[in-house]
């Protein structure tokens, strides 16, 4: 995709910087952050994050600062228009999904409903 406006999910600079720092210590330069959605949590769906060095057929890869974010097609349909960010604060540090498709979220922010 050459036009940034066509990318359906934003991978923020803060998230890319954190991913880059986390994978620098690993012995695998092909690692990327994978964000996915599963059923569960108190609101019906929950976000998950893992490091992955495989890109499956149909996966979307978004690059920022020479690191990648991977999203599978099933999860992407729930994340269109959203963003993956990284925050640090008094309540700790974590990757955060801002999802405009979520009709409600739980107090912890890791589960949502559509």
Curated annotation (Swiss-Prot):
<comment type="subunit">
    <text>Homodimer.</text>
</comment>
<dbReference type="GO" id="GO:0051537">
    <property type="term" value="F:2 iron, 2 sulfur cluster binding"/>
</dbReference>
<keyword id="KW-0411">Iron-sulfur</keyword>
<dbReference type="GO" id="GO:0051539">
    <property type="term" value="F:4 iron, 4 sulfur cluster binding"/>
</dbReference>
<dbReference type="InterPro" id="IPR016092">
    <property type="entry name" value="FeS_cluster_insertion"/>
</dbReference>
<feature type="binding site">
    <location>
        <position position="108"/>
    </location>
    <ligand>
        <name>iron-sulfur cluster</name>
    </ligand>
</feature>
<dbReference type="InterPro" id="IPR000361">
    <property type="entry name" value="FeS_biogenesis"/>
</dbReference>
<feature type="binding site">
    <location>
        <position position="106"/>
    </location>
    <ligand>
        <name>iron-sulfur cluster</name>
    </ligand>
</feature>
<dbReference type="GO" id="GO:0005829">
    <property type="term" value="C:cytosol"/>
</dbReference>
<dbReference type="InterPro" id="IPR035903">
    <property type="entry name" value="HesB-like_dom_sf"/>
</dbReference>
<dbReference type="GO" id="GO:0016226">
    <property type="term" value="P:iron-sulfur cluster assembly"/>
</dbReference>
<dbReference type="InterPro" id="IPR017870">
    <property type="entry name" value="FeS_cluster_insertion_CS"/>
</dbReference>
<keyword id="KW-0479">Metal-binding</keyword>
<dbReference type="InterPro" id="IPR023063">
    <property type="entry name" value="FeS_cluster_insertion_RrpA"/>
</dbReference>
<feature type="binding site">
    <location>
        <position position="42"/>
    </location>
    <ligand>
        <name>iron-sulfur cluster</name>
    </ligand>
</feature>
<keyword id="KW-0408">Iron</keyword>
<protein>
    <recommendedName>
        <fullName>Iron-sulfur cluster insertion protein ErpA</fullName>
    </recommendedName>
</protein>
<comment type="function">
    <text>Required for insertion of 4Fe-4S clusters for at least IspG.</text>
</comment>
<dbReference type="GO" id="GO:0005506">
    <property type="term" value="F:iron ion binding"/>
</dbReference>
<comment type="similarity">
    <text>Belongs to the HesB/IscA family.</text>
</comment>
<dbReference type="Pfam" id="PF01521">
    <property type="entry name" value="Fe-S_biosyn"/>
</dbReference>
